[in-house]
Structure formats: C-alpha cells, structure tokens
Amino acid sequence: MQYGEIITAKITDENATHYFVQKNGQTFALAKDQTDGEHYQLEEEIEGLIYEDMDHRPVIQINLPDIRPGFFGWGTITQVRKDLGVFVDIGLYNKDIVVSLDDLPDDRSHWPQKADCLYLTIMVDQKNRFWGQIANYEEIAKLFKPAPQRLMNQDVEARIFQLKLAGAQLITKEGYRAFVHESEWILPPRLGQKVQARVTKVHPDGSLNLSLKPRAHEAIEDDATMLLRLLDKSPNHFLPLHDKSDPEVIKSYLGISKGQFKRAVGSLLKDKKIRQEKEKGLYLIDKDDLSETR
C-alpha cells in the first residue's frame, strides 16, 4: 500500500490513546483524540488516509485533510530550513510535509516565512515519503473569478502565489487574480506572503493591478508626522533643513526624498504647525498639536 491512499480497514485492538486497524497484514494507529468523540468496536471497519507520522509510526486519519494526493489547498508554513526547504501544515495529525528547496525561489529572501501560506498538493515518492508540490498557474487559475469595477482604488487582501521577474502574481481572499509590478513593492515580496494592497486598475477581464505603496496623502501624513516628532525632540525645536537644502543631505538626515520633504513641509505649513525661515530651517510653532499625531 502507498501512503496517501484512502483505505478501509478493520479495528483489531485498542489501548487508552489509540485504536489499531489492519489492512493486508499491515497495522495503522488511529489516535482516539482524532475521532471527534466517536467510539469504535473491535472488528468495526473505518475509512481513512494512511501515512507515516513524525514519530515514524504508520497511522490512519479519518478526518480527511483538504490537501492530499490529487487535491489542492492552502497549507501554512510552520518552519523554514535553509538546507531542506519549508515545512507545511496541511491538516495531518502529528505531521508536517516538506516543500523542497528545489521547488522554491533561488533567492532565499523570496522564500515563504513562518505563517505564510502556499497552495499545494501532496506527492508521494518511491520511498513512500510525502513532499509538498506547489500548484502551477493553471491549477490556481481554477480559483479565479472576475473582480467588479467598483474595486478601483479600494484596499484588498491578497496572497502571493507566483513570483516573476517583473513582479508577482497574487490571488485576493475573494478569488480575484492580481498582479503587482516590481516598482510597486516597498520590500522584496515572498512566495506565500499575505499583503494589504491598493487596487490601481481593474482590467476588462476582471483581473487587478495592485500597489503596496501608500496613497499620496497617506505618505505625506507619515512624513509630516516624522518631521513633527523630530522637531519636538530637536534643540529649540529646530531642524536645519529647507527648500534649498541638498537632496542628499535631506535623504541622509530624514531617509526621504527632497520631493517628499517639500510635500510634508507644505502640509505642515498649511496646518500652521511649523514655520519656515528662508534658507535657515524649520521651527515647531504649536507643540500642543503634536500630541494629536501620535
């Protein structure tokens, strides 16, 4: 018999924690805490999936996982081993399966991390070992459905299922196909990563373009808040930066571009939270307002 098969077997023995079933002279253990309170009698037949658990015991599981040979589903990463690959919880009792490093991106910064999810199935090799097999595009495309036009500029939750040179393919939690171009990432994407993203385009076929970058007003708010906090902590509540400052000086001082700096300053001037002395710098003029931004 091959592990991963669903068999019908007869109960031949039990102890305090397990039932034991036999099929063709081979014995499999069934954990009693996995039977949903069901009690079985000797000679009664049960049906379940057989495999070897992490303690190297042949076992049978009667609550079939969604992910099994020929069936795909979402599995959760439980451990990352750079010398082996990633371990995935697919719903088997006392067993995770491995997705080999050979099936993962060459760049380990793109590997899934703990709690990320992969859409996959099980492959059983000639030594009766389970391996996770990541779904190809054609398989995951069976989940797709067209997105409505009203999603334009809305936020969606999506998961990366494929990485490409130009960006990443994702599927939203509703089943919409999405793409994020490499220019729209803030950090390098990971296979299996869940992201919150903004819809920048809804195509006629119902697929989406997404961006992980903040909206312009959100970016301004973040940069403005940073400036206020720096001014609050600086001697005399002053920063020696202005619209004539060298872009590299601004970048090294604040970590943002000169364009971002000018937009943030403009926003704070409009709100009367700072004043600007020409070619000298910025002063905080209303510390009471600062508490509202924290």
Predicted regions and their residues:
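Single-stranded RNA-binding regions, centering on S1/OB-family and related RNA-binding modules
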Residues: M1-R294
